[in-house]
Structures are given as C-alpha cells and as structure tokens.
A protein has these predicted regions:
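Beta-strand scaffold of nucleotide-dependent catalytic cores
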Residues: 55-58, 81-83
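Short polybasic amphipathic segments
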Residues: 70, 86-98
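A general structural signal for well-ordered alpha-helical segments in protein cores
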Residues: 6-7, 115-119, 145
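Active-site loop of classical SDR/Rossmann-like NAD(P)-dependent oxidoreductases
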Residues: 63, 106-118
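Short acidic/polar mixed-charge low-complexity motifs
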Residues: 17, 50-52, 75-78, 129, ...
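C-terminal helix-rich "cap/oligomerization" subdomain common to oxidoreductases
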Residues: 49, 123-173
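Rossmann-like dinucleotide-binding domain that binds NAD(P)(H)
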Residues: 1-53, 59-64, 136
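C-terminal substrate-binding/catalytic lobe of Rossmann-fold NAD(P)-dependent oxidoreductases
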Residues: 64-66, 73, 82-83, 116
C-alpha cells in the first residue's frame, strides 16, 4: 500500500511500461506491522519495456520526517524533485547545515498538486473534455504491485505477464 503511487510515477517519468519486478521486504521499524502480516521496509527494482531501470526504496518511517524524493538519471543528465520543507531556508555555520523539518501531512506536501487536479477535473466536466487518465492508467500500478508482492514472497524476479492475466477484470483504456 505504501508504494502504489511510486509504481505509477515510475511509468509516468520513464514513459515506459514495466515488464519485470524484483522486490525485497522486511519488518525493520514496527513489529506490530509484521504481526499483521505486512512489511514496513521495501526495495523494488522495476525493469521497463524501454530498458530503463527504476529503483524504489520505501520505509514507513524516516527519523527526520516524511521523505519522498525522485531522481531520474540518463545519458543527458539528471532531474530531481526534493522534499518539501516547512520553510525554504537553510542556516549554515561552522557546526554544519540546519534546515526546517520536512512537511509531514500529505495535504501540506501536495496541496498544489491536488488543486491542479481538481481544476483539471472541473475543466474536464464543465467543457465535456477527455479524461487525462484512463482505467488502464489505474490498473497498471495494481498489476505492478501484484507482481512486487509475488516477487517478495517467492524471492525472485516476476514478469508482469505472469500476474497480468490473473488479475480479475479487463480494464480498457
């Protein structure tokens, strides 16, 4: 549940579908999560149709606040999106660097994105325009998540084709 949006972002950023997944997970933070049959720490490698490789590191806890960053590396350079801090300031002294804490709640971190999505939705409904997302866009991360869970349980890479047909229903684009 904590990585589904990362799967969606990987497809969007690379512009390529995922063809294979390898996932490892552990309980490293909260034993109660393990007792409930879940994990709190995961590392996932996605292989894309284009040959691009995505690595995702995920944990339910970062001691310094909610940490969500993305970096894309390629032959022409790198693009990155860093964490959002409560204030955009840094103090540098002879003892090192200090910054305000990271934004903690998702509404604070993604306020601008939610407003943009609502505006696009209202525009689509008002002007009877096409949806920028299809059922297939929603289904793809679910298929990747299913492959990741199978990979983690079986300790092996899993091809998307192994789980795609097993997911009930066929969502058309």
């Amino acid at each position: 549940d904590m990585t589904i949006h990362d799967f969606d972002m990987a497809r969007y950023i690379t512009g390529s579908e995922v063809v294979e997944v390898f996932a490892k997970g552990a309980v490293r933070v909260d034993a109660a999560i393990g007792a409930a049959g879940d994990i709190d720490t995961a590392v996932i490698v996605l292989i894309h149709q284009s040959g691009a490789i995505t690595t995702i590191g995920n944990s339910r806890k970062a001691a310094y606040g909610y940490d969500q960053r993305v970096e894309a590396f390629g032959s022409l350079g790198m693009a990155a999106s860093d964490n959002t801090h409560q204030f955009n300031s840094t103090l540098a002294t002879d003892t090192g660097y200090r910054r305000p804490p990271l934004e903690n709640f998702f509404l604070e971190r993604y306020n601008r994105s939610y407003l943009d999505q609502w505006a696009a939705f209202v525009d689509m409904v008002t002007n009877d325009g096409p949806s920028p997302a299809s059922g297939a866009h929603g289904r793809a991360p679910l298929v990747i998540a299913t492959a990741a869970l199978k990979s983690m349980r079986e300790n092996r890479p899993v091809r998307i084709t192994e789980v795609d047909a097993a997911i009930e229903g066929n969502v058309e684009s």
